[in-house]
């Protein structure tokens, strides 16, 4: 997993509350186990019409929001069924940071396990971020827990364990591999059956 220290990018805005994992990535696209290729199906039923043409009224389809790597959204983002495909779709689309009023617990953890930074921020601060020019680069500094625009500076908090994992690009496998020698020692000491 790539370390996350400072990220600069533009923001897309989808301020709906209670966006669930079925809306993030519909069930018909969950037959694959690779982590890539899901970005084109992100928010599929909102982004496209029945003929698979882009819906011009959907915020992510706005020309000045394409290529955004920060998503600013409402409360309870990622609720619903637990599926890791939802963070895979967001990451594959290009998002590195999701700023919401709150997240479903499992979704929140799955974001960090996949190298994305979910930030909980109150509505007033999110509304200030939403007013940022669509072309402006927003800086997210994980180490100092600060978001900076040309006109505002916001502080956020993140649990120390998750912060360290993201800063160092560690997932469960890489953490386990840090103990490879101890695991081998343990296996040598244990009798085979």
From Swiss-Prot:
Gene3D superfamilies, per the entry: Aconitase, domain 4
An annotated GO cellular component: 3-isopropylmalate dehydratase complex
UniProt catalytic activity: (2R,3S)-3-isopropylmalate = (2S)-2-isopropylmalate
Keyword Lyase annotated: yes
BP terms from Gene Ontology: L-leucine biosynthetic process
Top-rank taxon, per record: Bacteria
UniProt keyword terms in alphabetical order: Amino-acid biosynthesis, Branched-chain amino acid biosynthesis, Leucine biosynthesis, Lyase
InterPro entries linked to this entry: 3-IsopropMal_deHydase_ssu, Aconitase/3IPM_dehydase_swvl, AconitaseA/IPMdHydase_ssu_swvl, IPMI_Swivel, LeuD
Biochemical pathway: Amino-acid biosynthesis; L-leucine biosynthesis; L-leucine from 3-methyl-2-oxobutanoate: step 2/4
Quaternary context: Heterodimer of LeuC and LeuD.
Similarity-based family: Belongs to the LeuD family. LeuD type 1 subfamily.
Function: Catalyzes the isomerization between 2-isopropylmalate and 3-isopropylmalate, via the formation of 2-isopropylmaleate.
Protein name: 3-isopropylmalate dehydratase small subunit
Organism taxonomic ancestry: Bacteria, Bacillati, Bacillota, Bacilli, Bacillales
